[in-house]
From Swiss-Prot:
PTM remark: May be phosphorylated.
Protein name (database record): Signal peptidase complex subunit 1
Organism placement in taxonomy: Eukaryota, Metazoa, Chordata, Craniata, Vertebrata
Keywords: Endoplasmic reticulum, Membrane, Transmembrane, Transmembrane helix
Quaternary organization: Component of the signal peptidase complex paralog A (SPC-A) composed of a catalytic subunit SEC11A and three accessory subunits SPCS1, SPCS2 and SPCS3. Component of the signal peptidase complex paralog C (SPC-C) composed of a catalytic subunit SEC11C and three accessory subunits SPCS1, SPCS2 and SPCS3. Within the complex, interacts with SPCS2 and SPCS3. The complex induces a local thinning of the ER membrane which is used to measure the length of the signal peptide (SP) h-region of protein substrates. This ensures the selectivity of the complex towards h-regions shorter than 18-20 amino acids.
UniProt organism field: Pongo abelii
Length: 169
């Protein structure tokens, strides 16, 4: 929670040390001396934590619209087993290649810093290639078994046979 008891609504709100809250209404702008700038001072106890539900209807803000989240939730996030293996091999290969190139360049230039920079760049590049679920990692989708009815529900508890393991002496 931000200083001043910010409720996540648009518009500035500040809390003084005494607990008084000054809330500026979003439609009204201007300096405090301006007649159109209106603030509402509320005295609240320090233990009170403001939430959008506890504010009066005039002060509460509407719920945020998840437009960006709807777009992100439509992206595929799964990766098949062969894709995971390919991503792991690519990750290790790029890291190894950048380490070798970085070591050789750092040795020739006699600058250890360049070795570190090249390895870090290889790590960033490998993360960019392997962490997102690119379509190359989803070429072999899993074939799930169909849902089967449970056969243990038909039998009564007394009809089940108890399997015992033989003792190994």
């Amino acid at each position: 929670m931000a200083r001043g008891g910010d409720t996540g609504c648009t518009g500035p709100s500040e809390t003084s040390a005494s607990g008084a809250v000054a809330i500026a209404f979003p439609g009204l702008e201007g300096p405090p001396a301006d007649a159109q700038y209106q603030t509402l001072a509320l005295t609240v106890p320090k233990s009170w934590s403001p939430s959008p539900r506890s504010l009066p209807p005039a002060l509460s803000c509407p719920p945020p619209q998840p437009a960006m989240l709807e777009h992100l939730s439509s992206l595929p996030t799964q990766m098949d087993y062969k894709g995971q293996k390919l991503a792991e091999q690519m990750f290790q290969g790029i890291i190894l290649f950048s380490a070798i190139v970085g070591f050789i360049y750092g040795y020739v230039a006699e600058q250890f810093g360049w070795t570190v920079y090249i390895v870090m760049a290889g790590f960033a590049f490998s993360c960019l290639l392997t962490l997102p679920p690119w379509p190359i990692y989803r070429r072999h989708p899993l074939k799930w078994l169909p849902v089967q009815e449970s056969s243990t529900d038909d039998k009564k508890p007394g009809e089940r046979k108890i399997k015992r393991h033989a003792k190994n002496n």
